[in-house]
């Protein structure tokens, strides 16, 4: 928080920081931060609803309770660098009333993660026709936040929902920062779930492209059918089952009452 304050203090804008406590029971240092004119509010959730839903709840709260022009959702672990907030603000002059995304140009993960990230991008494009190169580190004008909080897929995937509601974006180049402390607690299984949740937002695209793949592939193997050649089709069926199961996370009724999961909002 103090790093954000340092980076934005010379920008001619009024800033507020909203920290989402996602139901954590861990103790933290309750010292007051030196933030000069920046207002800091902590939104504490009663239960942990996951990363995407915590962001969605925060955006809904800000839209309904606060007066603002732009919101910049970002992780608080250091991987979304405060240095790049000024880039977002400067870009609002060029991308008027548009969502601006932070596209990663340099990543700090190992080769294994990088490999699976490339696989994720390929599968996303192959099955949805969408190239998604960003996460939640974005700059959203109020008009986009308004659309975001009435879109049911926002309760499932942040980036997937944003691509669904917006036809075009502005962008800045973003470098992944180093974590402030410790390794990420997100498991490989949760990373896979996160990836497939993005794809599940476009389940109808997935159906159409899967049917086309099935027809073309079956035509190719028609004269050479065996357990080996039909194995990819079994994998496709399993993939479709998972995608449709994850798409059930899109629940506008739960999203509409998400503010009831807020225990308190207090200044820090």
Identify the role of each PLM range:
Residues 13-24, 43-44:
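Short beta-strand/loop segment that forms part of the nucleotide-sugar
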Residues 113-128, 190-204, 208:
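Short hydrophobic helices that act as membrane-entry/anchoring signals
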Residues 92, 143-205:
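Catalytic donor/gating beta->alpha subdomain of glycosyltransferases that bind UDP-sugars
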Residues 207-268:
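Terminal low-complexity segments of carbohydrate-biosynthetic enzymes
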Residues 2-14:
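Short, acidic, metal-binding catalytic loop of nucleotide-sugar glycosyltransferases
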Residues 45-47, 51-61, 70-73, 79-156, ...:
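Acceptor/aglycone-binding surface of glycosyltransferases and processive sugar-polymer synthases
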Residues 21-29, 78-79:
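A conserved acidic beta->alpha catalytic loop
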Residues 4, 58, 77, 123, ...:
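Residue-level signature of catalytic and energy-coupling elements of molecular machines
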């Amino acid at each position: 928080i103090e790093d954000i304050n340092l980076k934005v203090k010379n920008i001619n804008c009024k800033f507020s920081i909203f920290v989402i406590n996602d139901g954590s029971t861990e103790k933290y240092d309750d010292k007051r931060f030196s933030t000069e004119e920046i207002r800091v509010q902590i939104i504490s959730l009663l239960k942990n609803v996951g990363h995407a839903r915590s962001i969605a709840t925060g955006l809904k709260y800000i839209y309904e309770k606060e007066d603002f022009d732009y919101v910049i959702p970002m992780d608080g672990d250091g991987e979304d660098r405060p240095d790049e907030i000024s880039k977002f603000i400067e870009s609002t002059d060029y991308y008027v009333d548009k969502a601006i995304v932070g596209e990663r140009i340099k990543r700090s993960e190992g080769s294994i993660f990088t490999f699976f990230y490339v696989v994720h991008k390929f599968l996303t494009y192959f099955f949805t026709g969408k190239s998604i190169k960003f996460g939640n580190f974005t700059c959203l004008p109020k008009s986009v936040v308004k659309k975001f909080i009435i879109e049911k897929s926002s309760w499932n995937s942040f980036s997937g929902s944003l691509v669904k509601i917006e036809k075009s974006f502005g962008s800045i180049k973003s470098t992944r920062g180093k974590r402030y402390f410790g390794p990420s607690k997100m498991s490989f299984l949760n990373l896979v779930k996160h990836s497939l949740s993005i794809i599940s937002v476009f389940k109808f695209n997935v159906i159409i492209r899967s049917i086309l793949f099935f027809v073309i592939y079956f035509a190719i193997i028609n004269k050479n059918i065996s357990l080996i050649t039909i194995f990819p089709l079994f994998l496709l069926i399993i993939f479709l089952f998972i995608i449709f199961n994850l798409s059930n996370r899109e629940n506008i009724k739960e999203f509409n009452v998400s503010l009831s999961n807020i225990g308190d909002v207090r200044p820090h």
